[in-house]
Amino acid sequence: MATFLRPELSNFRAYSTPTSDSLPLELDYLDTNEFPWDLPTALKEVLAQQYVSTLASHRYPDSHHWPLRQAIARYVSEQSPTEISPHQIAVGNGSDELIRSILLATAIGGYGSILVAEPTFSIYGILAQTLGIPVHRATRDPDTFAVEIAAANTLIAQAAPPVRVLFMLQPNSPTGNPLTAAEVDWLRQLPEDILVVIDEAYFEFSGKTLVGDLAAHPNWLILRTFSKAFRLAAHRVGYAIGNAEVIAVLEKVRLPYNLPTFSQVAAQVVLDHRQALLAEIPTVLAQRDRLYKWLQSCPQLHVWPSVANFLFFRLREPQHTPSLWDALRDQGTLVRAIAGGIRVTIGTPAQMERFWQRLQASLNQQKSTDN
């Protein structure tokens, strides 16, 4: 490895997705928790008209995102007992950019470390490692996936450099479980020198939010995204909600002109039409509950309940998990192999039917091979 490159990156594992040349041409993508349907054609036509009539391609984007921040603040205020100001909103090129800004603002250069509870979204630890920030990994109960709070407190007490940021996904991914009352109480009792980041990427599916706690906890920050329920994964729009002082610092450390104009316009358009878009969420949840019952009926599997748009299950003979992933991929269904199990995104009814048929065929094939 070249001497000008940091040596700890030589064996570093980046966030990975399957390469397109290794996949079948016709594929059901049930691995990234995207919404099963694209934006309606009518909304795409609205966006196209915006591009033609108002978007100046030779101009840099609005670096302050002010109209979008105002629109987001109005939306979040609908879920908050107190009004949320645009000054409490930061917008990023996906939540990933906001996570990186948080790390730059809090823990880089030996100033601090972070705490995560695994299994969880891997990008928290990945981005911290790319910045040379130590990552402390708390454990979860193997049956419920609730954080083992006593062990987490021990990590916090012993951490050097000190824990500056705790990342908590609500509900958690890949497991789909919401925060328990005990976990929320624990977060509320953490010292104010720890930034508590609550990632609500799946809020629109779970209906669970802690935005009402922000006023009482200036060291809390909530992350959300337009990539899931709002169907803008291709546009990469995430946002943070928090104390205006913290938001101002995040604005200082991010790149200028970080979000393309078209992405800003798209986010405003879907917010303007949110009632129609979010009205389809019950259909997704019904598909999730149906698949959960199917998976429960399968003796080879252990499936966990979920309040998000995905389900997590493990094989009772976990050594077969890699071959199951391969078999599903070869039949045309891509899922996420993670945390010793499989996470499957809730897709269209047709995709769910195909997944179930392919899963049964794969499990039957494994059973016959074992015999």
Swiss-Prot record:
CDD domains: AAT_like
Recorded catalytic activity of this chain's protein: L-histidinol phosphate + 2-oxoglutarate = 3-(imidazol-4-yl)-2-oxopropyl phosphate + L-glutamate
One Pfam family per UniProt: Aminotran_1_2
SUPFAM superfamilies given in the database record: PLP-dependent transferases (SSF53383)
EC assignment: 2.6.1.9
UniProt xrefs under InterPro entries: Aminotransferase_I/II_large (IPR004839), HisP_aminotrans (IPR005861), HistidinolP_aminotransfase (IPR050106), PyrdxlP-dep_Trfase (IPR015424), PyrdxlP-dep_Trfase_major (IPR015421), PyrdxlP-dep_Trfase_small (IPR015422)
Keywords for the protein's UniProt record, in alphabetical order: Amino-acid biosynthesis, Aminotransferase, Histidine biosynthesis, Pyridoxal phosphate, Transferase
Gene Ontology biological-process annotations: L-histidine biosynthetic process
GO molecular function: histidinol-phosphate transaminase activity; pyridoxal phosphate binding
Pathway the protein takes part in: Amino-acid biosynthesis; L-histidine biosynthesis; L-histidine from 5-phospho-alpha-D-ribose 1-diphosphate: step 7/9
Modification N6-(pyridoxal phosphate)lysine occurs at: 228
Cofactor: pyridoxal 5'-phosphate
Family, similarity comment: Belongs to the class-II pyridoxal-phosphate-dependent aminotransferase family. Histidinol-phosphate aminotransferase subfamily.
Self-association state and partner proteins as the record states: Homodimer.
Listed HAMAP family: HisC_aminotrans_2
NCBIfam families (UniProt xref): PRK02610.1 (NF002726)
Protein name: Histidinol-phosphate aminotransferase
Gene name as annotated: hisC
